[in-house]
Amino acid sequence: MTEWQAVVLGIVEGISEFLPISSTGHLILTAHILGIKHTDFVKSFEISIQLGSILAVVVLYFNRLIRDYEIWKRIIAAFIPTGIIGFLLYKLIKGFLIGNDLVVVVSLILGGIILIFADTYCEKFCYLGDVRELPLRKAFMIGVFQSIAVIPGVSRSGSTIIGGMLMGLNRKVAAEFSFLLAIPTMFAATTYDLIKSGGSFNAQEWNILIIGFITSFITALIVVKWFLNFLKSHSLKIFGFYRILIGLVYAAFFLF
């Protein structure tokens, strides 16, 4: 992988991580288009550059995070099922699911259909306008939804936003909770993967990781702000249809 390829993947990560469209699917597809082989380092790179996206959320929500204990209670409640399931299924995810093209295609298309239906449901039944109004048991259930995102192509943000809407959060608040829940979830996943890999990267690989990190950070800052403004006057259905389209494109590249 070259430096400019790391920049492109960093931009793709920053755009797709917090939108309900699957960052994993987009990174795999982009890497294929760029001619990047899906080596162990590339797999670790795709996970590690998520730290840049995490930092963007920390920067944007820093004041709220250090002052609002009620939000942290809900983040922790939602993280519990995700942490347990992610830890138990790490080897399966790393060894089989990551790189399985059929799994990604099915996840993208099925996830798009579910997102469309969930958004329609939310038009009538989403009534909570603040994360602090969310009961802890419902926060836990959102974490269960997030656990499904261990399957490549599902989308962590997509599953948590869908879970949030089904638990009664309006679109904007569901998206915000998804952003906040990303902090412990993505940090844990990235750290665990780096420990498992032994951090055994050479100087060139570390340089590529840093470039991807910085690029994803800057891109995510812009995308998070844009997405929240978008949700003030738009639904999520467009992302559902986009997932179906990109799933078909992915299938054309990898399955036919």
From Swiss-Prot:
InterPro entries: UppP. The chain crosses the membrane at residues 8-28, 41-61, 75-95, 96-116, 175-195, 208-228, 236-256. It holds the Pfam family BacA. It is a multi-pass membrane protein. It is found in: Cell inner membrane. GO terms for cellular component: plasma membrane. Its EC number is 3.6.1.27. It catalyses: di-trans,octa-cis-undecaprenyl diphosphate + H2O = di-trans,octa-cis-undecaprenyl phosphate + phosphate + H(+). One of its GO terms (biological process) is peptidoglycan biosynthetic process. GO terms for molecular function: undecaprenyl-diphosphatase activity. Keywords: Antibiotic resistance, Cell inner membrane, Cell membrane, Cell shape, Cell wall biogenesis/degradation, Hydrolase, Membrane, Peptidoglycan synthesis, Transmembrane, Transmembrane helix. Catalyzes the dephosphorylation of undecaprenyl diphosphate (UPP). Confers resistance to bacitracin. Belongs to the UppP family. Bacitracin is thought to be involved in the inhibition of peptidoglycan synthesis by sequestering undecaprenyl diphosphate, thereby reducing the pool of lipid carrier available. This is Undecaprenyl-diphosphatase. It comes from Aquifex aeolicus (strain VF5). The lineage of its organism: Bacteria, Pseudomonadati, Aquificota, Aquificia, Aquificales. The gene is uppP.
